[in-house]
Structures are given as C-alpha cells and as structure tokens.
Curated annotation (Swiss-Prot):
Recorded GO CC terms: cytoplasm; small ribosomal subunit
Organism: Pseudothermotoga lettingae (strain ATCC BAA-301 / DSM 14385 / NBRC 107922 / TMO) (Thermotoga lettingae)
Entries under InterPro entries matching the protein: Ribosomal_uS19, Ribosomal_uS19_bac-type, Ribosomal_uS19_SF
Function text: Protein S19 forms a complex with S13 that binds strongly to the 16S ribosomal RNA.
Top-level taxon of the source organism: Bacteria
Chain residue ranges for the region called Disordered: 76-95
HAMAP family (UniProt xref): Ribosomal_uS19
GO MF term list: rRNA binding; structural constituent of ribosome
Recorded family membership: Belongs to the universal ribosomal protein uS19 family.
Keywords recorded for this protein, A-Z: Ribonucleoprotein, Ribosomal protein, RNA-binding, rRNA-binding
Protein name: Small ribosomal subunit protein uS19
Signal peptide: none
Length: 95
C-alpha cells in the first residue's frame, strides 16, 4: 500500500539536514546512511549517498530518474551465488 499523499514522502530528518547543508555549501561529499526506507527527493539529485546493505555501505549516485524511489532499492542485501551447474546437478542421479 502506498503512503498517503497527505503525509508526504518519508525522509530521515538527519539525512535531509546533511543534504541541505551540502547544497548550501556546494560540496560533493559522500553521505553515509542506514536509512534504506528514505524516499529520494529532488534535493538529493547529484549527490552520492552510501546506503547500508547490512554488511557495508554501497555508494549510490542519485540521478533524476531515481526521484520517488527508496534508497534501499539501489543497495541489494542478498548476494547471488549463481545457478547450479548442469553437470553438478546430474552427477548424482542414477539412470
């Protein structure tokens, strides 16, 4: 279910404060955050935000296409080990 328009998008207040300070000073520093649930707002465009994936921080460069999405969408939490080889899967089978 989508968040109510009346409430507006959720953005971690500390993260928003850091982004606004960087916008005022004109700096381009990497901002670390654990707030994967924060919605990307237009103020964040052009910044790099290091989003925590449970193990480490993944740097995510924010573009205009990302506005409205959540930060956590761009930092995967699971490692894909690959599919099993066909040889390994059929090796133990008796025919």
């Amino acid at each position: 279910m989508a968040r109510s328009r009346k409430k507006g998008p959720y953005v971690d207040p500390k993260l928003l404060k850091k982004i606004r300070m960087l916008n005022e000073s004109g700096e381009k520093k990497i901002v670390k955050t654990w707030s994967r649930a924060s919605t990307i707002v237009p103020e964040m465009v052009g910044h790099t935000i290091a989003v925590h994936n449970g193990l480490k921080h993944i740097p995510v460069y924010i573009t205009e296409n990302m506005v409205g999405h959540r930060l956590g969408e761009f930092a995967p939490t699971r490692r894909f080990g690959g599919h099993a080889d066909k040889k390994a899967a059929t090796k133990g089978q008796v025919r």
